[in-house]
């Protein structure tokens, strides 16, 4: 049997659900961010009665749950309401033009025609938004250039001066200094309803990783002492994501060796203390 056949034919696994450890996985239960999620939903709620929503500005370091809260809120809204939602990831849609093309794609369920100017796309978007309520989530806006961020913020927040729109904006920022580097108009707009995401505590990281392990790994694959060690390491480097990646890598490693549980020596290779 070739190595390929051996690997592909094996059904041995230590995982119940590998997807749970993916960085883009949205859990059914949001841990340690209930208050923030509730605030976002409260701000959006007026849209259900066709009233003006409160815009939300989510501020916190990387790996503090902002994206998870946004995506969880969007999922709930899509499941329980008829509101249109548009998620923009400024790591990918990293220019003003790309942001408007993403909004257009969601609103019209098709790609914009090639060759159209950003101004024409923006005009089409604004006209469409006059017809329906919409939630626009702009994640990591600090990845836009300052000029593009200034324009996007001003255009969307000031749109009611020229268009009869009923939209809710959710913006995340992981670098607070970026906010103060913008033009005064954009800065004043961002002084809206700020929702703070403090760094996770050691206990919160442990709780989140424990929940993921219970849902994603088979019983006895990792013990509490090992999980606490990974949690301490993740807390020290301020990265919950690192803990999730590490558990996934450890699981895949022992699975490839047909072992049923993680040993302390396995963790020694990745955790320096």
Question: Which positions does each model-derived feature cover?
Answer:
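Walker A/P-loop nucleotide-binding motif
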Residues: 50-72, 92
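Post-Walker A helix-loop "phosphate-sensing" segment adjacent to the P-loop in P-loop NTPases
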Residues: 75-84, 108-111
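A short, basic N-terminal segment
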Residues: 1-53
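Alpha-helix termini
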Residues: 46-51, 77-80, 159-164
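Residue-level recognition of the N-termini of beta-strands and the immediately preceding loop/turn
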Residues: 53-56, 83-86, 133-134, 166-169
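Mid-core helix/loop region of P-loop NTP-binding domains shared across ATPases and GTPases
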Residues: 5-16, 22, 70, 91-208, ...
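Basic, amphipathic DNA-recognition helix from helix-turn-helix-like DNA-binding domains
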Residues: 273
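Conserved catalytic segments around the Walker B and adjacent sensor/switch elements
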Residues: 55-57, 79-92, 193
């Amino acid at each position: 049997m070739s190595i390929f056949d051996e690997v592909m034919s094996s059904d041995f696994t230590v995982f119940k659900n590998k997807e749970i450890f993916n960085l883009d996985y949205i859990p059914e239960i949001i841990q340690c961010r209930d208050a923030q999620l509730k605030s976002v939903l409260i701000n959006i709620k007026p849209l259900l009665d066709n009233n003006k929503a409160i815009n939300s500005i989510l501020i916190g370091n990387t790996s503090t749950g902002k994206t998870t809260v946004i995506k969880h809120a969007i999922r709930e809204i899509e499941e329980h309401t008829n509101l249109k939602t548009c998620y923009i990831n400024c790591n990918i849609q990293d220019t003003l033009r790309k942001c408007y093309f993403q909004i257009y794609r969601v609103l019209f369920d098709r790609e914009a025609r090639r060759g159209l100017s950003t101004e024409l796309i923006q005009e089409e978007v604004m006209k469409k938004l006059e017809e329906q309520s919409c939630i626009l989530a702009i994640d990591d806006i600090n990845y836009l250039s300052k000029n593009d961020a200034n324009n996007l913020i001003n255009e969307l927040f000031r749109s009611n001066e020229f268009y009869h729109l009923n939209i809710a904006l959710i913006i995340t920022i992981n670098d607070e200094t970026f906010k103060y580097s913008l033009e005064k108009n954009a800065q004043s707009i961002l002084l809206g309803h700020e929702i703070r995401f403090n760094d996770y505590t050691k206990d919160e990281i442990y709780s989140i990783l424990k929940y993921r392990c219970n849902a994603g790994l088979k019983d006895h694959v990792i013990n509490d002492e090992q999980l606490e060690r990974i949690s301490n390491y993740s807390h020290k480097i301020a990265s919950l994501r690192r803990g999730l990646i590490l558990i996934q890598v450890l699981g895949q490693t022992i699975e490839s060796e047909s072992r049923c549980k993680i040993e302390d020596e396995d963790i020694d290779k990745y955790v320096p203390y």
